[in-house]
Amino acid sequence: DGFGWTPMHFWVMQNNYELLELAIKGGANVDMQTLLDPKSEYNETLLFEAVKEAETYRVTQLLIELGANVNFITPTTPLDDAKGSRNKKLLKDAGAMTSAQLDKKYNIYWDSEECEKDESYMEKYCKLLNDAIKKAKESE
């Protein structure tokens, strides 16, 4: 659709982990993003959608098992948005952090005033933090 939603996004919302598993194991991107902001390359992934509802914890578990990035930042993270104790536990067990924890770990500060002055600030912030996380994972 116009927001970049695919059948996979709807399967997440419907808690249809069987079709999601088939699609991802068949080559679909586990970190597929919506296009809520077409100007941004950092929109919510399937995992963000899964953790928004406590009932979709099985989808959350599947996405994590299949390699979803638990620390993707938009500037919030899936853990910031998570509903339900099972989703939060699954994320934490997989190493997920809140955006504040990531900011502190990578010494990157979110400046909301700067964001109001410079529309590209959020994009730059997300890119910097996602790149830092990716490099840290590669060096582990």
What is each PLM-predicted segment?
Residues 21-29, 61-69, 92-97:
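Ankyrin repeat domain, specifically the short helix-to-loop turn at the C-terminus of the second helix
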Residues 1-8, 33-49, 72-81, 102-108:
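Ankyrin-repeat boundary/"N-cap" motif
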Residues 10-16, 41-42, 49-56, 81-86:
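Ankyrin repeat A-helix N-terminal signature
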Residues 66, 83-140:
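Ankyrin-repeat-protein effector appendages
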Residues 57, 70-72:
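Substrate-binding/catalytic groove segments of enzymes
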Residues 2-23, 28-30:
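Generic detector of contiguous secondary-structure segments
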